Design a protein with these regions (language model features):
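An N-terminal boundary/leader segment
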Residues: 17, 29-31, 47-157, 383, ...
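Sec-dependent signal peptide cleavage junction
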Residues: 25-38, 657-658, 681
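Gly/Ser-rich catalytic/binding loops embedded in alpha/beta enzyme cores
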Residues: 87-91, 108-277
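Acidic-enriched catalytic cores of C-N bond-cleaving enzymes acting on peptides and small amides
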Residues: 90-93, 323-344, 362-398, 411-425
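Short helix-loop capping/hinge segments that flank enzyme active sites or metal/cofactor-binding pockets
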Residues: 107-112, 177-203, 411-469, 482-485, ...
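Structural helix-boundary/capping segments
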Residues: 147, 220, 271, 276-359, ...
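C-terminal low-complexity, Ser/Thr- and acidic/Pro-rich disordered "stalk" regions positioned immediately N-terminal
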Residues: 599-654
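A cross-kingdom C-terminal cell-surface attachment/processing module
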Residues: 642, 647-653, 658-683
Length: 689
């Protein structure tokens, strides 16, 4: 009988312990899974953007009028209204107009964090399946623009009312990017009612009356155009800054520039405004900002994409920047001309790969850039690829002299610049030094000699192409840094003060001295980006991929080049890296202003905190949440740990109500359990007696 009592006591005690453990665990789950609704940023009529010396906000309303607002120290905007656009006559002048009516955000199915983490196809699939509407995506995007743009200065015009109306009317005709918000570059990608001034301060207020062919194509793919992004004057620079719009700040660190010339688009994607934004590339203008903001930047083969001729000597191509390789692949599939054929390769590992750590200009390459390449070389070798170090068969300085000659040939576009400056109350110092230099050299050139020089430069372009084609016969894929250093500070000069003064007074120089000065003024920029121009001068494809994060928390890209029409092969390599190595994309957090990254010349630690794809490819019924990083942590550990976005899986939710037990129910179960155990013990005691 005593043994029977012991067994019953043991059983009852076990049941009690298990019940208590289950109840405590349930209570803990309930406490940890309680969520608050994501706060929705109030929508505004204005998109505010800043300029270091003259903080202003500028955009175009539905009527086509320009809007600028002074940014107060607390980042709120003081806006006034005028009836018509007018030109800025002083650095601190304000210009505003009536803006579109406020449209309140109605998004309840998508949090800001989840939106920022999705790529274009994710969002299109959500629209197509009815999980969210295009209008909700558009409102979400505008809310984020209103929040992020005051510190970034990425967006220069918006069209909110029109975008919402287009989203409401959108029909599903199997478009690949159904209802996805898109921002387009303010240079060359005109939208009806948007600005079309090439970044020239004296052309401010000039409004486009039509959509460009590229914008029409993007609309055909299902995109909803939100507005235009910032760019440097005429796209000359590898940074984004102009006297008209000011600098675009880097989302990774606001003290640094986003790069150029498609810097506004890059900053918009990196900060989570839109998953895709359009760009153009005549010397690296897609790949450079992609390198400095952690994005995928494809420069297609010359003539491969619609509206471009394959047999021309144009250096410019047009293609969107993305944060995933699959978005780039889909875009290429739909933007490629029907008469063009892409090369296909079944086994990537069958392709020998070459790489270099040396600048074709003979300039310094930072340790960060070298480490990025060697990190990728090591990865490729471990994956079974054959990788060989070589020297580039091209003289980068000779190539840039030819590039300068082609730029001077554009001088005819500035024939009225002096008259236009005077008419609007500006001087030559109010345009970019390159613009003024091209104008003066062109006006003082012997046109027959200039034509001869241009033809000679084009012959050299053929030679450069043949040299690279010969290289690709042996090594189909060529690896190099996209940029030789990390993103520059916004205060870093893009031309020396001495050369700037000389350019604005170059009328007093001989033509030979002018050309020498023009070639020399590129130097500060080319030290940062000596690699990208080769693809433009040869017409061959290249892609920048974001596989490396420096010790200081700034990304730097790796560029892959290949032969003509190997564009899809390059994207397949990007996909391989994204899947097995990891990308630093998927929405990056904005680093605290007080963190000062290096300028790219320090020895970094291995990138242990990359946002590998395995961290973000979560189950459909899991929610991605951001792990906050405090300022204190940033200060103490930035030297050793890159400050990238971290992700964690939340518990699956089965609906709008919590599936966990409430604390009251847990207590009730505990009391019932104790009552049951007590009664059983008494009964056992009676039986024993």
């Amino acid at each position: 009988m005593e043994d029977q009592m012991k067994r019953k006591y043991f059983i009852l005690n076990t049941v009690t312990v298990l019940t208590l453990a289950a109840a405590m665990n349930t209570s803990s789950i309930y406490a940890n899974s309680t969520e608050t609704s994501a706060s929705v940023v109030p929508t505004t009529n204005t998109i505010v953007q800043t300029n270091d010396s003259n903080p202003t906000a500028k955009f175009v309303s539905e009527s086509g009028q320009s809007v600028i607002g002074q940014v107060k120290p607390d980042n709120s905007a003081a806006l006034t209204t005028v009836d018509t656009p007018h030109h800025i006559s002083a650095p601190d002048a304000l210009k505003t107009t009536r803006s579109s009516p406020v449209v309140e955000s109605t998004s309840t199915k998508l949090t800001e964090e989840t939106y920022k983490q999705k790529d274009g196809q994710d969002l299109a699939n959500m629209v197509r399946s009815g999980q969210v509407t295009s209008e909700e995506l558009v409102n979400m995007a505008y809310d984020i623009i209103a929040k992020e743009n005051p510190s970034l200065n990425a967006v220069i015009t918006t069209r909110r009312q029109e975008a919402i109306e287009e989203a409401r009317k959108l029909k599903d005709t199997n478009q690949p990017f159904l209802g996805v918000p898109l921002l387009v570059k303010g240079l060359g990608h005109s939208i009806k009612g948007g600005e079309t001034n090439n970044g020239l301060i004296y052309a401010d207020g000039k409004i486009s009356t039509f959509d460009s062919s590229y914008v029409k194509k993007y609309k055909d793919l299902g995109f909803i155009i939100l507005g235009q992004t910032n760019f440097p004057e005429y796209g000359w620079r590898n940074i984004t800054d102009s006297k008209l719009y000011g600098p675009t700040h880097n989302p990774w660190n606001l003290d640094h520039n986003a790069g150029g010339s498609s810097g506004g688009s890059a900053a918009a994607i990196a900060s989570g405004m839109t998953p895709i934004a359009s760009g153009s590339d005549a010397g690296g203008s897609i790949r450079i900002p992609s390198s400095w903001t952690g994005l995928v930047g494809l420069k297609p083969t010359r003539g491969l994409v619609s509206n471009e001729k394959p047999d021309s000597y144009s250096t410019a191509v047009h293609f969107p920047l993305t944060k995933s390789s699959r978005d780039a692949e889909t875009l290429l599939t739909y933007l490629k001309k029907s008469d063009q054929t892409l090369v296909s390769v079944n086994d990537l590992k069958s392709l020998p790969i070459a790489y270099t750590l040396k600048s074709p200009m003979g300039t310094e390459v930072s340790q960060d850039a070298k480490n990025a390449i060697m990190d990728n070389v090591t990865f490729l070798r471990k994956q079974g690829f054959k990788v060989t170090e070589i020297d580039l068969p091209i003289d980068g300085r000779a190539l840039m002299r030819d590039y300068s000659t082609l730029a001077i040939g554009m001088g005819g576009a500035f024939s009225t610049i002096e008259k236009d400056l005077k008419k609007h109350g500006f001087t030559k110092e109010d345009v970019d030094p390159i613009t003024w230099a091209v104008h003066v050299i062109y006006q003082n050139s012997d046109k027959a000699e200039l034509k001869k020089s241009i033809m000679e430069a084009q012959k050299h372009m053929d030679d450069y192409r043949k040299a690279m084609e010969n290289l690709h016969k042996q090594f189909p894929i060529f690896l190099s840094p996209t940029t030789a250093s990390l993103a520059p500070l916004n205060t870093d000069p893009y031309v020396t003060e001495e050369d700037k003064r000389a350019i604005y007074n170059m009328e007093n120089l001989s033509q030979e001295e002018r050309i020498a000065l023009f070639n020399r003024q590129w130097e500060p920029m080319l030290r940062r980006t000596p690699f990208t121009q080769i693809a433009n001068m040869t017409g061959l494809p290249a892609i920048s991929i974001p596989t490396y994060l420096s010790e200081s928390g700034l990304p730097i890209g790796t560029m892959l080049m290949a032969g003509a029409n190997y564009d899809m092969v390059l994207i397949k390599f990007a996909t391989f890296f994204e899947k097995y190595h990891g990308f630093n994309v998927k929405w990056q957090r904005i680093i605290d202003k007080e963190v000062k990254p290096s300028t790219g010349l320090i020895q970094p630690t291995p990138p242990l905190f990359k946002a590998h794809s395995s961290l973000v490819n979560l189950e459909e019924n899991s929610q991605v949440t951001q792990v906050s990083i405090s300022k204190k942590w940033m200060k103490s550990s930035v030297k050793n740990k890159p400050s990238v976005m971290a992700y964690q899986k939340a518990l699956p939710k089965t609906g709008d109500t919590e599936s966990s037990l409430s604390p009251a129910l847990v207590v009730t179960l505990l009391l019932a359990c104790f009552s049951f155990v007590t009664k059983r013990i008494r009964k056992v005691d009676c039986n024993v007696k």
